């Protein structure tokens, strides 16, 4: 129901977790990663790949991000290994860079489509305010354009990496997502909206336009 969906999305702004690392499990040829991104996840990712050389797909599930460097490095490792990525539920911040690492990138229908999105923003201080110096030093703009296979619009990326609050983001949903009174499925959130992302303003670009995904086929994770 729409009411339940809205409540769930609103709760994202208030979620906290004490999980020590991303939860990882391997099902067939798929590595499923969920939860917060923390320091040490790069090593754990490498260990999972070494122990399971047949992995071809990484599913990223319900992660609000976390450790900055891990998002970059794991995304780069995913691309280096030629793996595909799939978003299952929400994948925001550092998780979104891991997702962009996929050679092929898709949405899943593990959850309802209005609960499934990839969310991008900048880098932030501990108080939630934008850390412009870190955004510039790590080259976030160029990195996103590179890993979107050159498709991301630099002007829009520049806008989202300069969102002032870490509760803001640009959230990309699948074009087939059914949302009452909304034709566009990309949302620009400044971070002060009560209902994010569905209560945010919309943008007339799609995840496919921007190279967030490589096609619109919907995947299903092997544990669902």
Say what each PLM segment does.
Residues 33, 58-59, 99, 207:
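Terminal peptide-recognition signature
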Residues 4-16:
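Bacterial N-terminal signal peptides
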Residues 127-224:
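Charged, glycine-interspersed solvent-exposed loop segments at helix/strand-loop junctions
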Residues 54-70, 84-91:
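Short, glycine-/small-residue-enriched flexible loop/hinge segments at domain edges that mediate gating
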Residues 42-46, 71-75, 79, 96-100, ...:
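Extracytoplasmic/secreted envelope proteins and their assembly/folding machinery
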Residues 41, 49-53, 62, 78-82, ...:
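Sec/Tat-exported extracytoplasmic proteins
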Residues 21-44:
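STAS-typified acidic loop motif
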Residues 79-125:
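Glycine-rich beta-to-alpha active-site loop
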């Amino acid at each position: 129901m729409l009411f339940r969906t809205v409540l769930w999305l609103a709760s994202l702004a208030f979620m906290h977790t004490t999980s020590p690392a991303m939860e990882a499990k391997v099902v067939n040829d798929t590595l499923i990663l969920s939860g917060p991104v923390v320091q040490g996840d790069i090593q754990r990712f490498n260990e999972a790949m070494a122990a399971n050389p047949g992995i071809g797909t990484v599913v990223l599930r319900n992660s609000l991000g976390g450790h900055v460097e891990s998002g970059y490095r794991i995304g780069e490792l995913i691309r280096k290994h030629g793996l595909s990525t799939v978003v299952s539920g929400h994948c925001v911040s550092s998780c979104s860079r891991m997702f962009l690492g996929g050679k092929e990138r898709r949405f899943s229908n593990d959850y309802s489509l209005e609960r499934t999105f990839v969310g991008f923003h900048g880098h932030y201080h501990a108080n939630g305010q934008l850390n412009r110096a870190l955004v510039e030093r790590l080259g976030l703009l160029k990195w996103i354009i590179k890993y979107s296979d050159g498709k991301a619009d630099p002007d829009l990326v520049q806008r989202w990496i300069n969102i002032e609050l870490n509760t803001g983001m640009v959230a990309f949903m699948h074009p087939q997502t059914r949302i009452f009174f909304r034709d566009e499925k990309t949302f620009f959130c400044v971070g002060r909206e009560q209902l994010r992302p569905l209560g945010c303003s919309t943008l007339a670009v799609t995840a496919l336009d921007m190279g967030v995904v490589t096609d619109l086929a919907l995947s299903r994770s092997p544990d669902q």
